[in-house]
């Protein structure tokens, strides 16, 4: 993201290291990005004139995801075979395969772009990569951040039924037929609760080694203080997919007598009917609590903290509090009630 410089001439209306949001000044999403050579300029005159000013480049945010999940794959199979005589065999099979997964994404996110609390000497809060306009390290005062307890629970049930018959109708003629029916359904439910805070400051290095960033707040221990986390928004999503298939195949072989021009005639027919339906989630709001609260004022089961994140690496925070995704999923309607949202979650269309 582009920022104006820390000192020297600044575009009108800007303060040191202010982020440039105006897309009339720069175009996001280009394949080459913006030039990163030292002294590169942007034209801040959005009219016919030219007003070139130097700029800096930096990331606007950092995040860490501490993810865990449990997956199950239940399955069952039944096969029955019946041969009433030497010339016919009937086989029935029923098969079930399931998939169940519950995922908890413990997300820590912090902005690193705020320009309003840089102190009397903003230039002292950053360092650049030599010969570039890329910010390598910086200290940002009062950065907004949030943690989010994201829970996704999803499952698939698939049932297959098949009936097969084989007949030796004569010495020359054999026939085989197969009928199979399949039905599958996939359901997914997502619910998340966010908490927010504004700490005193963050000190960061966008590449502390091997392309991995490093950051610490003025007091990382505050991340474990539930009273310092304000309750944020509730997010919900839901989806369903259904599929079915009906397949009939018939195969036959007829052997001609010796001396015939042809030895064998093989023939077959197949009918396949498949269907699929995708149900979109209905648009759902992302409300705040009707009355502001901190995480400390929420039900005890909602609090969760991790430990030794990233194998205890000392260049990033090692633990933080977050809404417990497992508890939120298990008490989804209770959580929805706190946010004045209807029970059952969003509908699917």
Residue ranges and their predicted role:
Residues 1-117, 122-130, 154-164:
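Transmembrane beta-barrel wall of Gram-negative outer-membrane proteins
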Residues 4, 8-59, 122-143, 204-233, ...:
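Flexible glycine-rich, low-complexity coil/linker segments exposed to the extracellular/periplasmic environment
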Residues 4-25, 175-176, 180-197:
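Amphipathic, soluble alpha/beta structural segments
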Residues 14-15, 107-111, 191-196, 281-288:
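Short secondary-structure boundary/capping segments
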Residues 59-105, 140-192, 224-283, 311-349:
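Outer-membrane beta-barrel transmembrane strands
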Residues 113-116, 198-201, 210-211, 288:
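Short, intrinsically disordered/low-complexity patches at protein termini
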Residues 192, 202-205:
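Outer-membrane beta-barrel domain signature, especially the mid-to-C-terminal portions
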